[in-house]
Amino acid sequence: MTAVYAGFWVERRTEHGVVQALPADAQGFCPKRPSVSGPRNATDCVMFAGNCKRKEDKLVQSFYDTMIAGQRYMLILQGLGFTILIAVCAILIGTVLGCFFALMKVSDRKILKGIANFYTTVLRAIPLATQLMIFYFVIFAPLGMNRLLVAILAYGFNSGAYCTEIFRAGIQGIDKGQTEAGLSLGLNKNQTLFKIILPQAVKAVLPTYTSEFIVLIKETSVASFIAVMDLTKAGDMIRNATYNAWIPLLTCAVIYLILTIGLTKVFGLLEKRMAKSDR
């Protein structure tokens, strides 16, 4: 029986033919398996744990130096307060304006439809940051109005344009047979609208309305264009003071995420309760 090396393999000649095999003395020719990183014994485990502990301590110290020292976290809380205040006040203004202009859009009078169409077209076409600066530097500049109030009005009017289309779609999405049924019961057109159509429209538009509120919260991040210290501006101020960007900005991102998820859950529960009331 003879063996001839051919690369890594050896030809072993037998009476049945040629069989390829990898002999023991050829193991050195095989490529080695990559070593597995990580601790392999007790000493390595101790060193690995020590490295993790040092990194954790460094992260905690970095967070303390950036956010806790100098009470910079108060800037985040203050910015969060302004963000929530702007968003809540703006969505209330937007809801009122949206209802008003939506009713104008579904009316039979062309002049009312024209006014509502002009409002929604202009406010939805111009970027929000541009509207914000127009409100502050042009419209309300002679009055010297407070920046925060100007921001609330600008966001409210912008939200109103989107709420108008949301409510209009909800009203027109209700089957016309509902209106005919109300009229057949002796209700006039306005009574039918407010007692039959609008309650059904509210349930239909709730998911879209929730999305508008969430978008509005995120859009408050451009309030700093007129020097309003919203949540994002607070994070940027901490970044400028500490030269550490990722901790304050990541903190702001997590807060926005919590607000968004929280609102989604709250409105989801409200939607479920309204759905149960129909049964």
Where are these regions (language model features)?
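Basic polycationic patches enriched in arginine
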Residues: 12-13, 33, 40, 54
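Charged/polar low-complexity intrinsically disordered segments
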Residues: 20, 27-31, 40
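Short linear motifs in low-complexity or flexible loops
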Residues: 2-3, 14, 21-26
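Short hydrophobic alpha-helical segments enriched in small aliphatic residues
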Residues: 6, 17, 26, 42, ...
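Intrinsically disordered, low-complexity segments
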Residues: 33-35, 60
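Transmembrane alpha-helices and adjacent helix-loop boundaries
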Residues: 53-279
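Short, Lys/Arg-enriched N-terminal segments with co-localized hydrophobic residues
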Residues: 39-59
